[in-house]
């Protein structure tokens, strides 16, 4: 059931009877007393919060440097001039690719769109020009697909031999293999040429590492980085830092000096914005005080903020990040109530109260649930229906657990795409959009296509990483166990099938993220894709949310605290 999970062990839980206050609309104070003697419940020992408010407030927040601001503006115009300078098509593609991987493409959205539109209009001629250039063809294909332009996999047919297979000699070109590999992960359903290209490129890149075919350490690093995770699946902000530092290490990197300096300054300036936001939401969370009153739940304010940076890192999306962080905190707390602490009777009452969204309906709830409902009610009143849907999905899984029921795989996944909280997340992204219009509001129901595979991917990533720990505490059977029981296969086979399901759902996402009719639709689809990428980061090989030390702590430092050296 868990959106985020942790390793568990028995926990002795007791509340002092002390008042707890929740402030509503800055004027009304709603008061509730914490319960004195809880019922017999399941419990968990979660790792403690690593980022208390004192630690966050101690972080150095750089004051705005007018000299640095002026330098950023100057470099931005220099880069814009470089974009508009006459250049060969391959140089143009390389520049656009660098703008995206360096994390500064958002400054030049219109310039990039105009350039790609021009290239797309001449696609047939350019493809002929690149008849022997696999690297350039693959970059062209990837950039067009990534930015919503229609381009067929047929662009790679010219690299096949008389038997219809990719020519073996192509494997000797590591740069071409890297570009083909990255392009292949933008495949859609039933694109066999791209599927074969993915297998071909993967095999040859593995040989590069295993047989020492490349003498350059940096080239081997790039190959290992790609094989660990393709660009299309990576959390953008994490890759941006890696790519900037990779360009710094590579003396011969073919990156414009002004562009690289601009990318470093922009990264650090954006990080300062994030740091200030983190301090603000940390103060809100501390003053709210609910984490102290409900200690059975995971306290993950900083990690919840990191999720939002993965979804929309640009400074202009500050309001979304702040409000979504608050929602993430409540999702975690509600998830732990359903997974760990609440009795079935209490959960049914709580679900009904959330569904009714009536402040007068809380009298029948136990005191700890009153606290939780009031916190959610006072903070997130805009997304009422989505919170109700989430709690209903949680309740379904709670009933499965209490009845000892193992659902069919499809039944589990259908409910799981709701209990993973995707709809709550996307609703916040929708409501906090910068360019939201009445027309966009009227079209809200027009975006379900990309949401279905997105929600399934989130559930699959979560279950693959957290199921072992959750089952140890006696949680409901996960998709792996449902698959094992229904199909009569081993856990290893079931996990393999889940990984194939991940690829299949990514193909659906790629098919649904094509052409857009407005900047708002473009923003929403990009937000959804970035949500998937961030889920992948938090559940890559292990539960990096529940076990918040290790890699997650490292990336908090990398993205939110330590600036790039200039």
Model feature map: region roles:
Residues 2-566:
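Terpene synthase/cyclase
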